[in-house]
Amino acid sequence: MASRPISFVTGNAKKLEEVRAILGAAFPREIVAVKLDLPELQGEVDDICRKKCLEAARNVKGPVLVEDTCLCFNALKGLPGPYIKWFLEKLGPEGLHKLLDGWEDKSAQAVCTFAYAPDEQGEVLLFQGRTEGDIVFPRGSRDFGWDPIFQPKGYDKTYAELPKERKNEISHRFRALDKLREYFGGEGGK
């Protein structure tokens, strides 16, 4: 019997495209997009992901995958963190960069956490990836969130300036999905 597709809860077509590109054709399960209005939760990223995943599994009644992305400025002790979506919406890329005007430390961590549940009663598994970098004045395309202000360590370009293929080999999302792919390649993901 074939496994049911995994419902990736997102309304962001670019995110779905990136996830599929990173996982590749050899990934053993089909990933389908499902748009759900889940409650916007507050708290620590692991707790947010677990709760969001269980709520999604109750709605979908099957295997689900949810994602939460954080951008953590070291000078601001981890803020905006899981609230990056709201900061970006209100301030834009220039405003996010300007938040660090008073600090010498422009370093940051991009953090991506995927939560997977096989069903509504299943244990929620977390897969997290991190990329170190710096917050810079916006450069590059503005079609994917805060990519224009995040310059990964060891690079002279922002995520937005890098070719998609290169970004998908080094990003926080890649690192998290690599762990997910490893899980599904082993005994646990069957």
From Swiss-Prot:
GO terms for molecular function: dITP diphosphatase activity; ITP diphosphatase activity; metal ion binding; nucleotide binding; XTP diphosphatase activity. ITP binds at residues 10-15, 52, 68-69, 85, 144-147, 167, 172-173. The keyword Ion transport does not apply. It comes from the Eukaryota. Transmembrane segments: none annotated. One of its GO terms (cellular component) is cytoplasm. Pyrophosphatase that hydrolyzes non-canonical purine nucleotides such as inosine triphosphate (ITP), deoxyinosine triphosphate (dITP) or xanthosine 5'-triphosphate (XTP) to their respective monophosphate derivatives. The enzyme does not distinguish between the deoxy- and ribose forms. Probably excludes non-canonical purines from RNA and DNA precursor pools, thus preventing their incorporation into RNA and DNA and avoiding chromosomal lesions. It catalyses: ITP + H2O = IMP + diphosphate + H(+); dITP + H2O = dIMP + diphosphate + H(+); XTP + H2O = XMP + diphosphate + H(+). Binds 1 divalent metal cation per subunit; can use either Mg(2+) or Mn(2+). Its cofactor is Mg(2+); Mn(2+). Its main location: cytoplasm. It is found in: Cytoplasm. Homodimer. The keyword Disulfide bond does not apply. It holds the Pfam family Ham1p_like. NCBIfam families: RdgB/HAM1 family non-canonical purine NTP pyrophosphatase. This is Inosine triphosphate pyrophosphatase. Belongs to the HAM1 NTPase family. Keywords: Cytoplasm, Hydrolase, Magnesium, Manganese, Metal-binding, Nucleotide metabolism, Nucleotide-binding. GO terms for biological process: deoxyribonucleoside triphosphate catabolic process; nucleotide metabolic process.
